[in-house]
Amino acid sequence: MDTVHSAVGSSKTLLTFFFTREKLFLAFLMNRNTEGSVRLVLDRLEKRFGTFDFLTLFEYILTDRGAEFGDPDSLETGVTGIQRTNIYYCDPMRSGQKGGIEQAHTMLRMILPKRTTFEFLTQWDVNLITSHINSTPRESLNGRTPYDVALEAFGEDVLKAFQLRRIDPDKVILTPKLIRYNPVSYTHLTLPT
């Protein structure tokens, strides 16, 4: 679990997850980069899947020591008051311990380059972005896509609940053109260097 920040001046942030075996990448738009916002995403996912299925999917979560992840007890405790996950922290200055998510962030930044504000994004846009990223074949999966591997591992209902869909690999777009901008707000998407 990690966060990807918007341009300076924007409070919106993406909370991201990476399933290491399947290489499946998820992202959820948050209005602020706070522990409360992270908990809200986890609560919504737990309600969507139910506590047992949430625990099955998110049994262990590895993250960094960002302030938004600073109270593991709060994040580990579910909406029913029972423990829903186990939070573990990377060692300081060891981003390689969660290298898979960093590689997924690199793909995300191909679509949403640094200095891009997320103020214009909707969760629908984020789901489209993650669907394209997860439909990109990976060498580490013997040329298969994370979507297809996750479909076998988790089933179609889980991928639908994550609001992911399969994109034909020939139609995958990993550029800013993927998100169609409103021309009126286009000038507000990036900040000058």
Residue ranges and their predicted role:
Residues 1-26:
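An active-site-proximal beta-strand-loop segment
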Residues 6-10, 27-52:
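Active-site beta-loop-alpha junctions of metal-dependent nucleic acid enzymes
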Residues 22-26, 52-59, 112:
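Short, surface-exposed connector motifs at secondary-structure boundaries
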Residues 54-71, 91-93:
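Acidic/histidine-rich, metal-coordinating catalytic segments
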Residues 77-78, 84-178:
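Charged alpha-helix within mobile-element recombinases
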Residues 186-193:
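Conserved small/polar residues in nucleotide/adenosyl-binding loops
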